[in-house]
């Protein structure tokens, strides 16, 4: 990651290069960097954890995220790419809004910047936390040390290489995430054997029957309510307003590359979300002696 920061730093010749990669991102980098930064630790830890704890009904969240992703690429991406150039070649979302609506008093740019800063402090904190936990579990390092190391590495390559470094590292992470969600289910099935998955689920301390646990239309042993489905689907609404995703649309090279990005991103998200849910179920079968408590996961 640090090497990517050093290499991309040499390509930054102007502020447009530093903040938007010179609007020259290729289709694959645009797609995977957008989706990797979007899904991040949530897809690797949060979604499988929800399915592990509460059952397949949590897949409605994944469905909502998929719908939101598709709408974002189909409705927002192309228009934002075109209009940010027309609106004074804007390099940030606040600048685009200000230029697009001819805000001479900088009211829009101020409000949008404040909103982004406030909410992204929380969002970034959760991303750093999930990264720290993952790094700590892999290296056996103390969580706080892992958090600091991860944060320092991210800050260094971001300051060195700017937007291009961020997108390149996110592209690499997107490939690694895809390999991970493909490999884990295969390895679990090999280790457990197909005949042991359902018996392990039955013996894993479920609060409901295994068939209800595996049914997306059942929640707590009863048919899932429309409100629960709607609230989970609503997770996808946020995608059309996430600045760190939208800025990728602004930076793609041209409309042709954007069309390629759309296809790659949607396929990546579909595969990754489905497998993340599968990992949650298989994880319950594989780790069935482990139960959830207020202090975290423990073995009984």
Predicted features along the sequence, with ranges:
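Membrane-interface "cap" regions at the ends of multi-pass membrane proteins
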Residues: 1-45, 158-161, 186, 193
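Hydrophobic alpha-helical transmembrane segments
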Residues: 3-19, 57-62, 91-96, 121-124, ...
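Membrane-embedded alpha-helical core segments of multi-pass
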Residues: 1, 68-76, 116, 157-161, ...
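Short, Lys/Arg-enriched, Gly/Pro-containing loop segments at transmembrane-helix junctions
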Residues: 14-19, 85-89, 196-201
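Loop-to-helix junctions at membrane interfaces in multi-pass transport proteins
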Residues: 23-25, 29, 46-63, 98, ...
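Short helix-coil transition sites and intra-membrane helix breaks within transmembrane domains
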Residues: 7-10, 37-41, 84-88, 120-127, ...
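Helix-loop-helix junctions that connect adjacent transmembrane helices in secondary transporters/permeases
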Residues: 52-160, 244, 248-300
């Amino acid at each position: 990651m640090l090497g990517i920061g050093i290499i991309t730093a040499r390509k930054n010749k102007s502020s447009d290069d530093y903040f938007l990669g010179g609007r020259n991102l290729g289709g694959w980098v645009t797609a995977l960097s957008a989706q990797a930064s979007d899904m991040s630790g949530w897809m690797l830890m949060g979604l499988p954890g929800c399915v592990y704890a509460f059952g397949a009904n949590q897949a409605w969240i994944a469905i909502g995220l998929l719908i939101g992703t598709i709408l974002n690429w189909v409705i927002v991406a192309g228009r934002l790419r075109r209009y940010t150039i027309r609106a004074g070649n804007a390099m940030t979302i606040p600048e685009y809004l200000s230029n697009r609506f001819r805000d001479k008093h900088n009211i829009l740019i101020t409000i949008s910047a404040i909103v982004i800063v406030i909410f992204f402090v929380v969002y970034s904190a959760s991303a750093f936390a999930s990264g720290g936990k993952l790094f700590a579990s892999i290296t056996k390092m103390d969580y706080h040390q892992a958090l600091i190391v991860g944060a320092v590495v991210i800050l260094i390559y971001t300051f060195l290489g700017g937007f291009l470094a961020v997108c390149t590292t996110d592209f690499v992470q997107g490939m690694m995430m895809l390999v991970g969600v493909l490999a884990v289910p295969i390895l679990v099935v090999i280790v457990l054997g197909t005949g042991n998955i359902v018996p392990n689920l039955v013996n894993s301390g479920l609060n409901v029957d295994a068939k209800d646990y595996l049914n997306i239309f059942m929640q707590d042993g009863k048919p899932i309510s429309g409100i629960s489905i709607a609230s989970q689907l609503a997770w996808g609404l946020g995608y059309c307003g996430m600045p760190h995703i939208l800025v990728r649309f602004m930076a793609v090279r041209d409309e042709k590359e954007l069309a390629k990005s759309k296809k790659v991103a949607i396929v990546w998200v579909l595969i990754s979300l489905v497998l993340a849910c599968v990992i949650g179920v298989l994880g319950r079968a594989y780790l069935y002696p482990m139960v959830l408590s207020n202090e975290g996961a423990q073995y009984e």
